């Protein structure tokens, strides 16, 4: 790496678990780019200082992960309309004039993963059921609404939180009582779990799939483990499945292109490398 190397990184607290440095490092090496992508562990009380220093330190930008994705919104000079709508920033880009732009690429990452993982799925093929109403759900619902999904049935343990999401994002969102989540799967062409239930160390998602058509696509945004209990049960009944790793990989593409000037590809080789 030379003195003219372009720099980017990921801001989080903690950040040691992030696969982003491995992911971006793969692309940098593959493309022969003079650059580096660094993990930046930043406590919440130091976030503003670090954000302000990024342009001076020669950074082209950074990814933002938990717990900073909402707090960083008030620290940027320009906010992308989608990031404002979703209510979170996951990508920072230093503009040529040194100002900071906040973007959200999670919706893009989710949708591209779905398209690559199940090319035959069409947004207009029927309703989608979305489980959860956290930050990830906001990106998923925005992506589905923008793609033209006719109805999005949103179920969350806290109905109030689901109702807030629906009001904030608008579009064809129907809030479903948590007790009726299984029944709401009837006629759906897509099921997406946006919660952490099913992740290693967490309990499994309690969801009966009996009402879900066997032709429906089942997507879990969890990727540790790669095949969650939900995906295993869906496979056993014949549903096509899409795992969550691709969302992480695809959401990284726009940021990498903005920082390093080349658009990377999400390949099977990359998937294997990030998982290894």
From Swiss-Prot:
One of its GO terms (biological process) is aromatic amino acid family biosynthetic process. Its EC number is 1.1.1.25. The keyword NADP applies. Pfam families: SDH_C, Shikimate_DH, Shikimate_dh_N. Shikimate binds at residues 18-20, 65, 90, 106, 223. It comes from the Bacteria. Pathway: Metabolic intermediate biosynthesis; chorismate biosynthesis; chorismate from D-erythrose 4-phosphate and phosphoenolpyruvate: step 4/7. NADP(+) binds at residues 132-136, 221, 244. It catalyses: shikimate + NADP(+) = 3-dehydroshikimate + NADPH + H(+). Gene3D superfamilies: Leucine Dehydrogenase, chain A, domain 1 (3.40.50.10860), NAD(P)-binding Rossmann-like Domain (3.40.50.720). The active site is at 69 (proton acceptor). Involved in the biosynthesis of the chorismate, which leads to the biosynthesis of aromatic amino acids. Catalyzes the reversible NADPH linked reduction of 3-dehydroshikimate (DHSA) to yield shikimate (SA). Homodimer. This is Shikimate dehydrogenase (NADP(+)). It comes from Paramagnetospirillum magneticum (strain ATCC 700264 / AMB-1). The lineage of its organism: Bacteria, Pseudomonadati, Pseudomonadota, Alphaproteobacteria, Rhodospirillales.
């Amino acid at each position: 790496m030379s003195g003219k190397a372009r720099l980017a990184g990921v801001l989080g607290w903690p950040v040691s678990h992030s696969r982003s440095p491995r992911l971006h490092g793969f692309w940098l090496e593959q493309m022969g780019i003079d650059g580096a992508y660094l993990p930046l562990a930043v406590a919440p009380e130091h976030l503003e200082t670090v954000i302000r220093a990024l342009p001076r330190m020669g950074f082209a930008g950074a990814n933002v992960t938990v717990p900073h994705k909402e707090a960083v919104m008030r620290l940027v000079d320009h906010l992308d309309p989608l990031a404002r709508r979703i209510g979170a920033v996951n990508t920072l880009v230093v503009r040529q004039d040194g100002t900071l732009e906040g973007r959200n690429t999670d919706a893009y990452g989710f949708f591209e993963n779905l398209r690559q993982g199940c090319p035959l799925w069409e947004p207009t093929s029927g309703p989608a059921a979305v489980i959860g109403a956290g930050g990830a759900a906001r990106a998923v619902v925005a992506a589905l609404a923008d793609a033209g999904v006719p109805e999005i049935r949103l179920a969350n343990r806290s109905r109030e939180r689901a109702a807030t999401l629906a009001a904030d994002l608008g579009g064809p969102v129907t809030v479903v009582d948590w007790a009726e989540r299984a029944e709401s799967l009837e006629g759906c062409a897509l099921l997406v779990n946006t919660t952490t239930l099913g992740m290693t160390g967490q309990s499994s998602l309690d969801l009966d799939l009996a009402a879900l058509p066997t032709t429906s696509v089942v997507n879990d945004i969890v990727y540790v483990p790669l095949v969650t209990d939900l995906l295993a049960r869906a496979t056993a009944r014949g549903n096509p499945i899409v795992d969550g790793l691709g969302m992480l990989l695809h959401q990284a593409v726009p940021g990498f292109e903005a920082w390093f000037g080349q658009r990377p590809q999400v390949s099977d080789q990359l998937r294997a490398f990030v998982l290894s």
